[in-house]
C-alpha cells in the first residue's frame, strides 16, 4: 500500500486536478493515536487535504499547519505538512464516536461541529507566516476547504474527501481538488459540475479500485487529461511531540494578533 499524489491538467489546461490516495496515511494515524471510527474519518479527511496542499509548497523547509476549532465533541483538529506532502496530525478527543447520521454515514460534521473557525498557516520563509481563516461551513471538512479556497485564496475549487472505515481499520482514504485556471470559461465550469454530480464518492471510487488517473477523468469529464506531476509519495511522519506542535502554532497565532 503506497500513498500517492498525482496532478493533472484537464480541458486544454484550463482546469487543474490534484488527486490523492491517502489510505496508508490515515491508517497510520488511526493506529498511532488509537482513533475511533468517527475521529479516523474526521482527522483522516483533514490529513488528506493538508497533504495535498503541502505538495504545492516550493521550498524544502516550507510548511502548512491547518487547525479546525469547532464546537463538536472531537475538540480541535490539527494537521501539519511539509513540501513533500508528508503530514502529521492529532485531535483533542480521539476516542469520541458518534452514531451514524441520517443517511447512514459517519457523522463527521456533528463531531467537528458547525460553529467555529478553520485556520491555515503557511510558513514559506517570509518574515511572518501567512495566516488565512474562514468560518466552518458544515464541519464535513471538504466543504470547509472549498469555502477557504474561494474566500481566502480566490481560487474557485471543488474539494472531495473521503475515508472508508470498516472493522479492520481504514479501507480507503483519499480526495481530490479541482481548481479553475484564470482562463476557464462557463463551458468548463458546466462540464466539471456535471462530471462531479455524476461521479461516485471518492472513497467508493477508491474502493472500486479506480486509479487516480481514472478518478481524475471521471470527475472532470475529460478523457484527455495530461499528467503534470506523479512522483509524490507522502507519508505520515510524526517528528515532534504534540507540545512542540502546540508551541509552534501559538507562536504563529501570537504574531497574527500583533
Language-model segments: which ranges?
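Conserved small/polar residues in nucleotide/adenosyl-binding loops
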Residues: 247-254
